[in-house]
Amino acid sequence: MKTKILNLANEEIGEISLNEDIFAVEFIRDDIIKQVVDWQRAKAMAGTHKTKTVSEVSGTTKKPFKQKGTGNARQGSLRSVQMRGGGVIHGPVVRSHATKLPKKVRKLGLIHALSEKFSEGKLLVIDSLKLETPKTSNLVNILNKFQGKSFFVIDGNEVDVNFSLAAQNIYNTVVVPQIGANVYDIIRHEYVLLSQEAVNVLEERLK
């Protein structure tokens, strides 16, 4: 399967053959894509939420008032869960939200996400993702030629330093080497831009 190669001016300069088993899967498995996205988002959660239990709340352990004769319900501690400023029962604790997902499923998710973008006509192959200077304004002008609202840019094994620096302050634009290609960023950005080197490395990695 062939597709056109563009330059950074959005001009066609040639053709490249793409592996249909990676970029043109016939039946897109949205369920697999969702599984991988859920796995990614769970793994990214900090898990630093925490409330204090009765034993952790600061305060006295003295009985607030005598057992009998006050007309109030008996109380043993001001740190009890029913007291204002007391502990929290069954509250969140610091933990990892990460789950396990087989490598084959993760690989399938990436293949189906790339195929979905290609079927929409929003996966573009660029001859080279290199800039002479790290000027954000220059890169903004380049991306405007593709008429997209958001871009996920995937380069080869290494990202051009000037391109990476220029993209840092551009809203909804993420630049990664091929090892950083992931399902969540592919589906949440409107366009995916792949360098020729990225295509070759991804085909080798996902075959």
From Swiss-Prot:
Coiled coil: none annotated. Residues 53-76 are annotated as: Disordered. The keyword rRNA-binding applies. One of the primary rRNA binding proteins, this protein initially binds near the 5'-end of the 23S rRNA. It is important during the early stages of 50S assembly. It makes multiple contacts with different domains of the 23S rRNA in the assembled 50S subunit and ribosome. Pfam families: Ribosomal_L4. GO terms for molecular function: rRNA binding; structural constituent of ribosome. Belongs to the universal ribosomal protein uL4 family. Signal peptide: none annotated. This is Large ribosomal subunit protein uL4. Keywords: Ribonucleoprotein, Ribosomal protein, RNA-binding, rRNA-binding. HAMAP family: Ribosomal_uL4_B (MF_01328_B). One of its GO terms (cellular component) is ribonucleoprotein complex. InterPro entries: Ribosomal_uL4, Ribosomal_uL4-like, Ribosomal_uL4_dom_sf. Part of the 50S ribosomal subunit. It comes from Rickettsia bellii (strain OSU 85-389).
